[in-house]
Amino acid sequence: MQLSFPAIVLAAPGAVCAQGYPFSQRQTISQNVALTTVTVSYGRPVARGRPLWGQLVPWDSVWHPGADSATRVVFDHDVTIEGHALKAGEYSLWLVPHEQRPWTVIFSRAAHVFHKPYPGSSEDVLRVDVSPESASHMETLAIEFPVVLREQAVMRVHWGSTAVPIHIGAPYRPD
């Protein structure tokens, strides 16, 4: 059987989708803070009208902010996170949302993992508590740097009407 060119062209989009077109798009964002480069790579899930906090993302459980592979954060120099030291390196980012208290932000040394299951607290390098903020609705999860000053920045995880600001300190240290 010989297929005509139009038949092949019409069949091609289905073949592309069958090979795993991602439901959540990937994003990589880099931000310089003093002499430090912070790079974040993550999948961007879409709310699609679903209730997020306490339902799609359960309260008091470790959650990966993203889709597919775990969110990776790379610091090319030592930094502080909410005032706590974190060595230069590559980490996966995890959050524990709480309904009535600050959320827990986790940096894990298990940087190259899928988003489930959580690699476990034995892989945690740093845990800090951060108070979430109400924000305008963000349909697609976003990790952004809304504040960048000379030696500090805020990395914000924003999805739905909740944003989690994570303060990064990057002291100016010329080599």
Model-derived features: positions:
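Cleavable N-terminal signal peptides
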Residues: 5-6, 16
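Targeting-peptide/extracellular-domain and disordered-appendage signature
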Residues: 19-87, 92-175
